């Protein structure tokens, strides 16, 4: 300060501590999926885990983003507002097709649950972020899973 030397001010900055998030194992994810009673949440959790998506990425998915021929999904406005292509596992495609037969929304892959799955056909908004987070917290508490789930919760 004031262009004057500071005697004894040879300070070293403390290193940043970065903690890695807990990783959910396949067995733990299977317990989460099995314990989730609401079909749309069950399919959503399975989809996020199997494709490595973030919560917002999964909510924004549209029917047209699924490329079944090339077995990939177009994720729009991912982290950093970039698009990316994600591999689509065959089992996930099967689950998504079965789920779509239930709601039949022509645009949204995970339509709002506000009017139930019967009203999902005409839904113009995706599932509620807070509802998904609350459902996951309830399921993980129910099965006794103590891990922090960074991509979902």
What does each model-found stretch correspond to?
Residues 1-153:
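Conserved catalytic core of the tyrosine transesterase superfamily
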């Amino acid at each position: 300060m004031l262009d004057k030397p500071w005697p004894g001010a040879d300070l070293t900055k403390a290193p940043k501590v970065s903690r890695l998030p807990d990783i959910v194992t396949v067995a733990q994810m299977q317990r989460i999926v099995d314990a989730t009673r609401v079909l749309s949440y069950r399919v959503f959790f399975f989809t996020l885990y199997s494709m490595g998506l973030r919560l917002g990425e999964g909510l924004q998915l549209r029917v047209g983003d699924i490329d079944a021929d090339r077995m990939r999904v177009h994720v729009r406005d991912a982290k950093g507002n970039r698009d990316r292509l994600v591999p689509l596992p065959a089992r996930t495609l099967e689950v998504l097709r079965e789920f779509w037969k239930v709601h039949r929304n022509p645009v949204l892959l995970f339509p709002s649950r506000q009017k139930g799955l019967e009203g999902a056909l005409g839904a113009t908004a995706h599932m509620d972020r807070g509802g998904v987070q609350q459902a996951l917290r309830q399921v993980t508490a129910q099965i006794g899973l103590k891990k922090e789930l960074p991509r979902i919760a």
